[in-house]
């Protein structure tokens, strides 16, 4: 399979409960992550992480699937 460029958006509701699990999962898939930016939206009670990735569709599915199973975490991806 060919690798494709993509973006993954992650929102985290409970930072203290979910962030360690999110960071662990991202570290496990670090070989596909080209760039990462995280922003806290304290007034909204949400934290946002944006990832630039280069991966196969299977690799993207594995990462987003693991993240999506975490409580309080929502994930969306876009491949180009």
Language model region names:
Residues 1-80:
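Long, contiguous binding/interaction regions
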């Amino acid at each position: 399979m060919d690798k494709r460029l993509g973006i993954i958006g992650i929102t985290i509701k409970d930072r203290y409960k979910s962030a360690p699990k999110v960071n662990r999962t991202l570290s496990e898939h670090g070989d596909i992550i080209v760039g990462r930016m995280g922003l806290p939206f304290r007034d909204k009670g949400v934290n946002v992480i944006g990832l630039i990735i280069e991966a196969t569709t299977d690799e993207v599915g594995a990462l987003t699937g693991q993240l999506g199973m975490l409580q309080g975490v929502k994930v969306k991806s876009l491949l180009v």
